[in-house]
UniProtKB/Swiss-Prot annotation:
Chief location of this protein within or outside the cell: membrane
Keyword Cell wall biogenesis/degradation (UniProt): yes
Protein name: Undecaprenyl-diphosphatase 1
Other facts noted in the record for this chain: Bacitracin is thought to be involved in the inhibition of peptidoglycan synthesis by sequestering undecaprenyl diphosphate, thereby reducing the pool of lipid carrier available.
Subcellular location: Cell inner membrane
General function of this protein: Catalyzes the dephosphorylation of undecaprenyl diphosphate (UPP). Confers resistance to bacitracin.
Entry keyword set: Antibiotic resistance, Cell inner membrane, Cell membrane, Cell shape, Cell wall biogenesis/degradation, Hydrolase, Membrane, Peptidoglycan synthesis, Transmembrane, Transmembrane helix
Organism lineage: Bacteria, Pseudomonadati, Pseudomonadota, Alphaproteobacteria, Hyphomicrobiales
GO biological process: cell wall organization; peptidoglycan biosynthetic process; regulation of cell shape; response to antibiotic
Gene name per UniProt: uppP1
Bilayer-spanning residue ranges: 5-25, 43-63, 81-101, 107-127, 185-205, 214-234, 248-268
GO cellular component: plasma membrane
UniProt key word Transmembrane helix: yes
Length: 268
């Protein structure tokens, strides 16, 4: 393995783990890093499989709760309501994402200006919503009404545009619909599980001929980096947003988006 390739794998893995579960768009950051830093050697297989590190991070943090939900599912009405609610929220983006997959990957993902613009727009919206005097009505993710699960799922469809952010769209949607800040982030975590697993499986199937055994050492580096970083983020994000809200992430998006647009004007 070349040292440059190892550094690329490590940096992209860290970037994936750091940004996947916060409302700043992990896809946007990785695509911009690839554009400006020339991270091309890792390839599509790498970009797909490092997501598995982030997926396993959230599964490990919520393992006991997920296992208990699985045990309670046959006989507990509230658990069934929550699991069905997650599936309802998952379906809109899954359907649209599958139908528009090729357009999203070949057109939208190839536009760094679009990514930067969406980072800026999303940052402004996140800052505005975080400053609104919203009165939370829903604090328990397992007791959301069915229509609320669907409404949050419709907001998640916005994240199919790179630079928007899956967690950002679901969190903003949840906040506007009356969900408390901590519960908004927590439900975004749960919704991430079927969404990321589905996207991972679909992308892996579409690119099944790309992966070779020679890629495995590089993928392992990115995978571990993504797992460890995402593990840290998932463990501490809920407490952070409960105390501080989402303004930090709004400013983060603005800075990255503006710097990205300026860089595109200078270097293309």
């Amino acid at each position: 393995m070349e040292s440059q390739t190892i550094v690329e794998a490590l940096l992209l893995g860290l970037l994936e783990g750091l940004t996947e579960f916060i409302p700043v768009s992990s896809t946007g950051h990785i695509l911009l890093a690839g554009h400006f830093l020339g991270f091309n050697s890792t390839g599509k297989a790498f970009e797909i499989l490092i997501q598995l590190g982030a997926i396993l991070a959230i599964l490990s943090v919520y393992f006991r709760r997920l296992w208990q939900m699985l045990l309670d599912l046959p006989h507990d009405r509230l658990t069934r309501h929550f699991v069905i609610g997650i599936l309802i929220a998952f379906l809109p983006a899954a359907i649209i994402g599958a139908l528009a997959h090729d357009f999203i990957k070949t057109v939208l993902f190839e536009s760094p200006r679009l990514i930067c613009t969406m980072l800026i727009i999303g940052g402004v919206i996140l800052l505005a919503v975080d400053r609104m005097n919203l009165k939370p009505v829903y604090r328990d993710v397992e007791r959301f009404p069915t229509r609320l699960y669907l409404q949050i799922g419709l907001f998640q469809c916005l994240s199919l545009i790179p630079g928007t952010s899956r967690s950002g769209s679901t969190i903003v949607g949840a906040l506007l619909l009356g969900v408390d800040k901590r519960a908004a982030a927590e439900f975004s975590f749960f919704l991430a599980i079927p969404t990321m697993v589905g996207a991972f499986a679909f992308d892996l199937f579409k690119n099944r001929n790309v992966l070779t055994s020679a890629d495995l050492p590089i993928i392992a580096i990115g995978f571990v980096a993504a797992f460890v970083t995402a593990l840290f983020v998932v463990r501490y994000l809920l407490d952070y947003v409960s105390r501080n809200g989402y303004s930090l992430f709004g400013w983060w998006r603005l800075v990255v988006g503006i710097v990205g647009l300026v860089a595109l004007m200078i270097w293309g």
